[in-house]
Amino acid sequence: LKYLRNMIKISIIGGGGNVGYHLTAILLNAENIELIEVYNRTLDKIQYLKNDTSITTNLNQLKEADIYIICVADDAIVEVSKKLNFNNKLVVHTSGSVAMEELKCKANKGVFYLLQSFSKDKKIDFSNIPICIEATSKTDLELLKVLAKTISKNCYHINSEQRRNLHVSAVFVNNFVNHLYFIGNQICEDNNVPFEILHPIIKETASKIETLSPFDAQ
């Protein structure tokens, strides 16, 4: 692959969201990666990048890149992808629940799904994030693998159906569990007990899953 010898040029579409924010941060400092441009509907959320890379609000005049990474909300992926008129370029989205075929552009298609919960105010260690990739061609899949392994040790080839079900599993172990924390916190507040008293048992329960099956840890 020529990308093993040359810089991979990346354009991020939707740099103002949580995923786009963190992906921009890691790619700006990644080896053999050139983040040539970040797009967002409004400049205010990406203005801070003006000294590091090109920023734009115009989808019709994006710079030429090897990979265009769409980091917008799931329900905006179709509309955004329709506006990308590229040939022989790779366009990928980062959604866990949207099929690769939902990319409605002429370009080559793929998925670059980061299986992690992102918040702008919490720094993320990318080295252990599972990155699930999919592409319409072996060449593009190899390119995504090179990109993934540049920022993480964990790269998986996962198809759209597997990814959709994986996303459901992630909702159970992340969003549902976090809601249980919320309920626990409410009970503590109602009884004037500090929620911090539960931190050790929460951490112990979470750490068990690395050495025990969920059934055995129950």
Name each region found by the language model.
Residues I12-G14, I70, I133:
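Hydrophobic Val/Ile/Leu positions in short beta-strands of Rossmann-like dinucleotide-binding domains
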Residues I8, K89, I129:
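Nucleotide donor/acceptor-binding cores
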Residues D52, N108, K123-H167, V171-E210:
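Internal alpha-helical scaffold of NAD(P)-dependent oxidoreductase catalytic cores
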Residues R5-T57:
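NAD(P)+-binding Rossmann beta1-loop-alpha1 motif at the extreme N-terminus of oxidoreductases
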Residues E31-I33, K63, F126:
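Structured loop/turn residues at beta-strand edges in well-structured enzyme cores
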Residues Y39, L43-I124:
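Rossmann-like NAD(P)(H) cofactor-binding subdomain of soluble oxidoreductases
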Residues S213-Q218:
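C-terminal active-site/capping subdomain that shapes the small-molecule cofactor and substrate pocket
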Residues L23, V80, L143-L144:
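Hydrophobic side chains in well-ordered alpha-helices
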